[in-house]
Amino acid sequence: MKNRSRSQWISFLLSPILLAATSAHGQESDAEALAKAAQNPIASMISLPFQNNTNTNFGPQEKTQNVLNIQPVWPFSAGDNWNFITRTIVPVMSQPALTPNGSRTEGLGDITFSGFLSPKVAGQWIWGVGGIGLLPTGDKALTADKWGLGPAVVALTFNGPWVVGGLINNVWSVSGSGPNDVNLMTLQPFLNYNLPGARYFTFAPLITANWEAESGEQWTVPLGVGYGKIFKLGKLPVNGQVSLYHNVVKPTFGPDWQLRVQLQFMFPK
């Protein structure tokens, strides 16, 4: 009887500790699941990323360019078997002068809108197909002044702690009064490694090819690495990320380095 009473008291005293440990493990598992969802461009989750890109030695004057991309992601159900995921990029720009006597230009750039049709039940690979649209919303000197359309594809897979995939699109101008046609490819491969505690390393360079540019001036190819972590503001989960990239291939007046800082506010179901 004494032994049983003693064991009951020990269980009673330890129960708050065990409950707290179980709760902490559950919260950590939820955070790690959110970390992987944040790394899926077509996750069925509303999110609002603010991505700030600081580009050094940009333009003929070799000054700093800054682009804040506001990138809301909004998924919709498209029947029993499909989701339709929208991704909008609204750039707020601060661009240095491109001529010796010019001045810095600040304002809104051209908005891009992408939509992907993706299966609700994924196999080993998660994928989406759709299109991209270019809207001439930019302020003067920050716009191509062209409407554009093109295809867009994304695919990724999870393998243990690894996330591997990529996103590609190409937009062509279809109308508008701008003097130059638009024919621009954007490719973003990504390779992420997830760590305990909802932390991860990321490699997600934004590779572009301006097919309208002269030979030798078309490609921008960055290489670098970043670090991210899921944390909470109150009850709201946030994906914080910092990355640094060096453009190993670039046009003559393209930037040398890019510092990317992102806060992604997530609204899971």
Regions found by a protein language model. Give the residues of each.
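Generic cytosolic/nucleocytoplasmic N-terminal low-complexity/intrinsically disordered segments
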Residues: 1-2, 228
